[in-house]
Structure formats: structure tokens, C-alpha cells
Amino acid sequence: QTPSGLTRLADGRFVVADFGAKQLRIFDAGGRALRSIGRRGRGPGEFVAPSALDVLGAEEIVVLDVGTQRVSVVDVQGG
């Protein structure tokens, strides 16, 4: 695991960009892992080098993937 970005949702959950696993990882406010989103690749829902994160809405975040030079909007409930 290689964390490269972090943001906190309004309900206290954390979203971590994992550069090494090419995923986003969701944690509860206490640090317990809840789920992972994404996989290695260049298609929808896939990442090459996820890095910066920011909250867009209650369940949405913006992800900068420096490997694809792409910005994606991700729903943390549905991926």
C-alpha cells in the first residue's frame, strides 16, 4: 500500500488514494477499512496513478490520476 492522497467526507469517512494498489480505499472515522474502489487500468473505474482527491458532494469525490492525466468523479457508494 502506497497512500498518495487523502480526503475526509462530511460523515467522517476517509478516502485514501492508494498509488501502489491503483485503488481508492474507504475507511470509517475510526480507521476500519470499509471497501476499495477501482483497479489498475485506463478505462472507466480504473486508475494508473491515483494521487490527489477532493470532495465534490456528500458521496462524490474528484480523483486526479497523474498516470492518465485524467480527472474523474467517483461515487464512493457505487464506485
Name each region found by the language model.
Residues 1-79:
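Eukaryotic scaffold repeat domains enriched in small/polar residues
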